[in-house]
Amino acid sequence: MSAPLADIDPDIAGLLGQELGRQRDTLEMIASENFVPRAVLQAQGSVLTNKYAEGLPGRRYYGGCEYVDVVENIARDRAKALFGADFANVQPHSGAQANAAVLHALMTPGERLLGLDLANGGHLTHGMKLNFSGKLYDVGFYGVDPTTHLIDMDAVRAKALEFRPKVIIAGWSAYPRVLDFAAFASIADEVGAKLWVDMAHFAGLVAAGLHPSPVPHADVVSTTVHKTLGGPRSGLILGKQEYAKSINSAVFPGQQGGPLMHVIAAKAVALKIAGTEEFADRQRRTLSGARILAERLSGADVAAAGVSVVSGGTDVHLVLVDLRNSELDGQAAEDLLHEIGITVNRNAVPNDPRPPMVTSGLRVGTPALATRGFGDAEFSEVADVIATALAGGRGADLAALRDRVTRLARDFPLYEGLEDWALVGR
């Protein structure tokens, strides 16, 4: 029981060490990824992993929950206070589980759901035909303007009036602009629909007061905790008090059994951190870095190589890069940046002609580097590295670019001493 991981399972310990090395030595720019503080790692790796706690605080189906009840209540209270919500459920294991619970609570199978098309930046759980949401519900989609790549609220209203959905989703996985939540709420009211906002990507910006909050406008709001919020991989649901009972029962027993109490403890820690000035500063650097990146990727040298920025810029933590006129497709560009030590993900651009495993775009995000400590100077440097790589393609001096990446990574050490604590138990 007391032997460290390195002694019990050197294979897994070795792989964890290699992954730690990868995270330290490269620049993480996948928009949905971040680095959690050591306090979050400690909470998630705690003895709470041993405890079953089906039900809600004060109404459990197991004994011995006197301490985990307090932990969950702290997490719920912090979520409500941070976002100004009437209620919070912190039990969802993931964002997808949270979204499934929201749909389960607000709709019955066969009813109509209106969301942003996956091909235009929506998410799998917003009605994609191979996802549960697309199989259980009658789904309609709105999209972006083919020229501006912005959501046209007049077009959303027209679609809602025609389709008459039971629920309208406002949220995205790859859309670089702020949504008009008041307009979505007005449309939902006009057609008699419920408004659900999925703020998984921008919740940290909302918490810091740097992005409009959907909470005053939406009936229900879902989010992950691990993107801009910088917490453990998990989800939570917020909303109006009138939906608390149906949401709670949709999570348990509707979608899940026992909650992961060690993860809920880690959520509580992350939510506390999200109320600090240090967190707000990180979010300001996240936004500034994304704008620096968008501006550099709009430069003449990059444009000459057929690379452009979708919608002409960004309001959030990510930049969507259009490679349709470039010699590179999304997969090739992802691989190219991987070679120089920058991790991004290929991503479809609006109405992408290429298949989803190839794509014609990249999604590039700044949260993880802001968490690591990057400011404007460092974001300017990494933006220039990316621009140089994409403009030069396979003809770029990859060794020189890799050296620049290595210097940036070394200037911002990550998880110093973590091997002693996490792998060998010292």
Curated annotation (Swiss-Prot):
Pathway: One-carbon metabolism; tetrahydrofolate interconversion; Amino-acid biosynthesis; glycine biosynthesis; glycine from L-serine: step 1/1. It is found in: Cytoplasm. GO terms for cellular component: cytosol. The record marks H226 as: Plays an important role in substrate specificity. Its EC number is 2.1.2.1. The keyword Nucleotidyltransferase does not apply. (6S)-5,6,7,8-tetrahydrofolate binds at L118, G122, H123, L124. The keyword Transcription regulation does not apply. Catalyzes the reversible interconversion of serine and glycine with tetrahydrofolate (THF) serving as the one-carbon carrier. This reaction serves as the major source of one-carbon groups required for the biosynthesis of purines, thymidylate, methionine, and other important biomolecules. Also exhibits THF-independent aldolase activity toward beta-hydroxyamino acids, producing glycine and aldehydes, via a retro-aldol mechanism. This is Serine hydroxymethyltransferase. It comes from Mycobacterium avium (strain 104).
